[in-house]
């Protein structure tokens, strides 16, 4: 059934409680939005297969609770991850200020040095913005992260965030190939231009 799947990737979604991590995941996997979505208790987990530049990848996406009382789950949660989506709420500056704490945690527990990180400023559909787009971009550049602003409510930027993350992982030698070396898998020729396609207006590849 999965013969044409290039690889399976472990993706994490992290960030403060209430920034919309679960809503982003639900929009990406099920294309739905629930404004009354309850806070995640512990860890949620979803699987979705996507195609990027002609390469099919199965994503095992882990969504964690942002609350401090669930941090005991942290070490096993980070283990073996190839990509991380770090989310903040553009209408809550405190969630942006605390990004450094999440990066420190990532550095402490992540088992790979070449993990690909994507910074997502969520809830751009709201008017009471407290974090400017350029602030997010500057933070992402400082920490060598991909960056995008998105809205789980309107779907803006959501698909692009996951596609760009997966594309970057597939382009990173050693992140996924070792488990596939004996399967004879080959990359499809990737598109040379990062600026084209549906994501051109959103993502900054850093």
Swiss-Prot record:
Q: Which reaction does it catalyse?
A: GTP + H2O = GDP + phosphate + H(+)
Q: Output one GO MF annotation.
A: GTP binding
Q: Return one Gene Ontology term, BP aspect.
A: lipid droplet organization
Which residues are listed under lipidation as S-palmitoyl cysteine? Answer: 199
Do you know which SMART domains this protein is assigned to? ARF, RAB, RAN, RAS, RHO
- Which locations, inside or outside the cell, does it occupy? Endoplasmic reticulum membrane; Golgi apparatus, cis-Golgi network membrane; Lipid droplet; Apical cell membrane
Residues where N-acetylmethionine is found: 1
Q: Which top EC class applies here?
A: hydrolase
**What does UniProt say about this protein's domains?**
Switch 1, switch 2 and the interswitch regions are characteristic of Rab GTPases and mediate the interactions with Rab downstream effectors. The switch regions undergo conformational changes upon nucleotide binding which drive interaction with specific sets of effector proteins, with most effectors only binding to GTP-bound Rab.
What does the subunit section of this Swiss-Prot or TrEMBL entry state? Interacts (in GTP-bound form) with ZFYVE1. Interacts with ZW10 and this interaction is enhanced in the presence of ZFYVE1. Interacts with BSCL2.
The protein's name? Ras-related protein Rab-18
Species name for this entry? Rattus norvegicus
Q: What is the lineage of its organism?
A: Eukaryota, Metazoa, Chordata, Craniata, Vertebrata
């Amino acid at each position: 059934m999965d013969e044409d799947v290039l690889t399976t990737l472990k993706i994490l979604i992290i960030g403060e409680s209430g920034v919309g991590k679960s809503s982003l995941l639900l929009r990406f996997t099920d294309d739905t939005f629930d404004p009354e979505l309850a806070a995640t208790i512990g860890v949620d987990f979803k699987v979705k297969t996507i195609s990027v530049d002609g390469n099919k990848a199965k994503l095992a996406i882990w969504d964690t609770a942002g609350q401090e009382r669930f941090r005991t789950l942290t070490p096993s949660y980070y283990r073996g991850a190839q990509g991380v989506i770090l989310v903040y709420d553009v209408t809550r500056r405190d969630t942006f200020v605390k990004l450094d704490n999440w990066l420190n945690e990532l550095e402490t527990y992540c088992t790979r040095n070449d993990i690909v990180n994507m910074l997502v400023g969520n809830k751009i559909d709201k008017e009471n913005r407290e974090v400017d787009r350029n602030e997010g971009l500057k933070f992402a550049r400082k920490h060598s992260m991909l960056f995008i602003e998105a809205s789980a409510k309107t779907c803006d930027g959501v698909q692009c965030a996951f596609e760009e993350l997966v594309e970057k992982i597939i382009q990173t030698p050693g992140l996924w190939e070792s488990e596939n070396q004996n399967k004879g898998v080959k990359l499809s020729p990737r598109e040379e231009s990062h600026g084209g396609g549906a994501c051109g207006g959103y993502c900054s590849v850093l």
